Amino acid sequence: MAKPNALSLYQKVELQRPLQRALDVTIFFLLLALLAYRLLLVRTHGLCWLYAIAFLCESWFAFFWALTANLTWTPVQYQTYPQRLLKRVEEFPPVDVFITTADPVLEPPIITINTVLSLLAVEYPANKLACYVSDDGCSALTYYSLSEALKFAKIWVPFCKKYTVEVRAPFRYFSDNLSSAGSPEFQYERRRMKHAYEELNQRIEDAAKSFTFGNLVGDLADFSNTKPRNHAPIIKVIWENKEGIRDGLPHLVYVSREKRPNITHHNKAGAMNVLTRVSGLMTNAPYMMNLDCDMFVNNPDIILQAMCLFKDPIIRREFAFVQFPQCFYNDLQDDPFGNQWIITMQLTMRGMAGIQGPAYMGTGCIHRRKVLYGQSPNEANINEKYYDDELYKIFGNSKDFVTSATRVLRSVEDYPNCLADSTKATHEVATADYEHNSCWGSKVGWQYGSIVEDILTGMLIHKKGWKSAYLTPTPPAFLGCAPSGGPIPLNHHKRATTGLLETLISRNSPIATALFDKLQFRQRMFYLWMYLTSVQAIPEICYALLPAFCLIANFHFLPKVQEPVICIPLLLFILFVLRQMLGYIETDQSIRAWWNNHRMDMIKSMCSCLLGVVAVLLKILGLSETTFEVTKKESASSSDDTESSDRDLGRFTFDESPMFVPITTIMMIQLAALSIGFLGTQPGRREFGVGEVTCSVWLVLCFWPILKGMFAKGSYGLPWSTLFKSSALAFLFVYLCRMSTK
């Protein structure tokens, strides 16, 4: 590695992975060889529907493997030097930070305030930082919690900076046992902080039990008789750094946009656009960082890390946003639910950084405001380009906001000292119908039209020709709590795959705009890979049923052991497993972690991906609409878990969801096929071979949690309704297979 220049704020390092490249190419050519074998079979034995299905599935696998190999072909890594940036404090640009929450029950306020507290304590001048909290649930409890958290922040932030505390989310900091570390003064201060935090927690818990929302008074009176989906806008400045003190507290603003039952609110994308407009009137910072309410700041230098890139002239001219990885603190041993995303964050996203840049993942990202206002990389400052009537059509009818947007597009930085003067104007831009006849959600701001608004927004930014960067600092920038069990991560995955498939068939598809946008070819392949992951369920299910059919109906679709061509599928299997294992070894994970993630990928494909495809088909037929579902946020601390609960943390759980029916059906079919095959009840001489048996056994092993769920009880067992439906479908499949032999 070359020694970095003394004046450089960052270094871009190209990572070499020759072994992985060789395996990728070998696997691809083996897939082509398998397809050639299928064509030879058709030539010698004639067209058979069994071979035709196998050929179509394997063609898809070859195509999808080419997309997959593209992801990690040219990985890069950025190394930043924030200490060098500290010499240029006066040059630091202002940053507006958005934190979004939607439901005080599914997303308890204590989680949100920990994220807010960790943000208020970052190493960045407080007079150039503003925190906006969007509450889509219009909860008096959330506002009260933020107001109480401010009192704690006044002693917490100085404590963190005085003692250089690394983890600045109180619930995580106080979960560590540090009783014997530090000076007596530090120990005294720490005990005082812990006691104050426990009191804060208790006040919030008491408020949750005692609030009578119809009779709120004082500062909470605005929340009286409000409903989450029917209320006027509520915007309150909880704290304003009026003196512009660098070592004080950043601005803290509460925002609850107006909602009306008859006006579409566009879920999180709509909330983000309201935050963009409100902040544009109050602070109008050129950079905006957004966080989910459960992703606290784990690295206090994180904004400095991003500015090391944005201060570079080339990056400032070509790059739209800096994305940080999503990491989790509740990492169970060997990742039993495959929800730590380590391979995605450490390998896939670094691979994308070597093309046009990573996708925008909805949290842990710093955007340039002018990019979200629609500016292209080769477009100069607007100057007199737009007339006033054009600007009103783009940004809406607020004169004050159009003025602030114009200043951004002209690269004029302003940072008003008094937020209260902007309060009246902010209510106008937070109304439910403000975006009517404007370009919000289409040409400017976060994009509408998909429940994965983050991916869509990032892709449209890339389509304009912008690039993005990916930073992986140590310690990780942000940490959250990964969902545990079975239904929650599967429902989250179903929502994502539904939104991705919606985008694929929309006018924003990377295929539909191939002739007109500025996506690089390999970046287009990346987005195709992402959008097609949901469709992957169909060929995988078809291919999973082929060995079972062969065992039941006494056919074969794989070469027999005595045939030399058996080497092709055998080598494919071995090299594919080896290629996957190398990724886990490279990221310091165990072989057991590879196995857990592999089987969870299979389970997700058969469960959530399939239901995502069905949901989109029903939407196309006009039978239903896709909806944005808020997932329950957890805030677990390992110190609170008992030994017995630790043993249950890695156990798979089930509910009444229909998504478990397909995979349970496939498991029953494999068990029935293996039983019929080994009992030898098929008519005539045995035709199926070792390949078909191996495939079925492999699927049973992959779906082992489902097999255990068939016999377990309670939440760890499959519901009787799921078992009955799956049994009926499995019986029907076996019956049709036996009928095909007659």
Feature annotation, model-predicted:
Residues 1-467, 479-480, 490, 496-742:
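Glycosyltransferases that elongate glycans
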Residues 471-478:
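Membrane-helix and juxtamembrane interface regions of eukaryotic multi-pass membrane proteins
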